[in-house]
Swiss-Prot record:
Biological source species: Polynucleobacter necessarius subsp. necessarius (strain STIR1)
GO biological process, one term: terpenoid biosynthetic process
Transit peptide keyword on record: no
Pathway named in the protein's UniProt entry: Isoprenoid biosynthesis; isopentenyl diphosphate biosynthesis via DXP pathway; isopentenyl diphosphate from 1-deoxy-D-xylulose 5-phosphate: step 3/6
Keyword line: ATP-binding, Isoprene biosynthesis, Kinase, Nucleotide-binding, Transferase
Protein name: 4-diphosphocytidyl-2-C-methyl-D-erythritol kinase
GO MF annotation list: 4-(cytidine 5'-diphospho)-2-C-methyl-D-erythritol kinase activity; ATP binding
Amino acid sequence: MVNLDSLSLRSPAKLNLFLHIVGRRTDGYHLLQSVFQLIDWCDTLHLKRISENVVRRINPIPGVAPEHDLVVRAANLLKDFCQFEGGVEINLQKEIPMGAGMGGGSSDAATTLIGLNALWSLNLSKETLCALGLKLGADVPFFIFGKNAFVEGVGEKMREISLETPDFLVIFPNRGIATASIFQDPELTRDHAQITIDGFLTSPLLYQSNDCQAVAMRIYPEVKQALDWITQAVPGSQPRMSGSGSSVFAVLDSKTDIAKLKNFLQNLPKGWVGRVVRGLNKNPAYNLISFLQIDL
């Protein structure tokens, strides 16, 4: 094990290539099927080991109390679980929009667990980190899992899936969406027929729908506006929403004029954010972990 004083790791976003709601548990949690694709739209997490027995966030998000800050919660959860004597300073550089349906907060929490497991020399397994991550949010275990996945249950059942890594056009229409506002809506489809992983791999083009999209479009008109922008920018594409929104995306093929597309992005409505991003096959946080020969 390498002894570290500090660590900087990238926290990637994800896209839901499709999202089906297939049922609901008695406790109210929804059962889903989805394919999660990692993308190279990343936050950067800086962790510095300190002797004080405290978790300190250097640049807290305005308006977010520490008890609601996922990276602080993740650090304290791990610290308490291992009864670790010592602390950390956390500096998070945000690039992934909040409330975008791309898992930015969950990814940051996962990277905090991954990074502190190394920084504090805890030697916890991925399975243990995933179990801890699930206490923070349904998407956190996916980012700890670290590979593209066919996801089921409430998000805790994952099977690695081999995906191509194309370019994507992603637009965030500057509208944060609270997941609860979508999943509590009475018009949300909750009985989508289940599919198999083989069914998806055989005919992926048949599975490009998001059951949350119709509800989001009705409540948040910016979602439809963003979908219309992508349709205009990439004619013939099949844009859809990621997660519970509000980000929308389209897969780009090799014929897409990327330079022209980037010019298009400069003319988005004020406050909107758009990027051309590349799909990933692995959480980049693990690239540094592997380089440092830290086992997980």
